Swiss-Prot record:
The active site is at H48, D99. Its main location: secreted. This is Phospholipase A2. Belongs to the phospholipase A2 family. One of its GO terms (molecular function) is signaling receptor binding. Coiled coil: none annotated. Ca(2+) binds at Y28, G30, G32, D49. Its cofactor is Ca(2+). Activated by trypsin cleavage in the duodenum. Can also be activated by thrombin or autocatalytically. Its EC number is 3.1.1.4. GO terms for cellular component: extracellular region.
Length: 123
């Protein structure tokens, strides 16, 4: 779920305010996304969007009325390491790994302030 993704990003980047920092960044960070990613961070978001699209195609996710933004899962954070719980079902595990990989990606690439609230005409 979105609030868990927020927590994962805080785990990897404790100084961040994920919903403020990463929402409406570039062409893909935030709801929706199209065009060409503007940088590596935007590519992290594009990959995350594609991961959620794959999750929605899984049979184990089809029974859910929810979508990946609201479907919750179990994970833990210790010493900046994110672990998805083995108790997650197949769908939860998939979404957890989408979020985990994106949080790791965010922590490994530069943040360019000029790409925050980017006019989508540049996408």
């Amino acid at each position: 779920a979105l609030w868990q993704f927020n927590g994962m990003i805080k785990c990897k980047i404790p100084s961040s305010e994920p919903l403020l920092d990463f929402n409406n960044y570039g062409c893909y960070c935030g709801l929706g996304g199209s065009g060409t990613p503007v940088d590596d961070l935007d590519r992290c978001c594009q990959t995350h969007d594609n991961c959620y699209k794959q999750a929605k195609k899984l049979d184990s996710c089809k029974v859910l009325v929810d979508n990946p933004y609201t479907n919750s899962y179990s994970y833990s954070c210790s010493n900046k390491q994110i672990t998805c719980s083995s108790e997650n079902n197949a769908c939860e595990a998939f979404i957890c790994n989408c979020d985990r990989n994106a949080a790791i990606c965010f922590s490994e690439v530069p943040y360019n302030n000029e790409h925050k609230n980017l006019d989508k005409k540049y996408c």
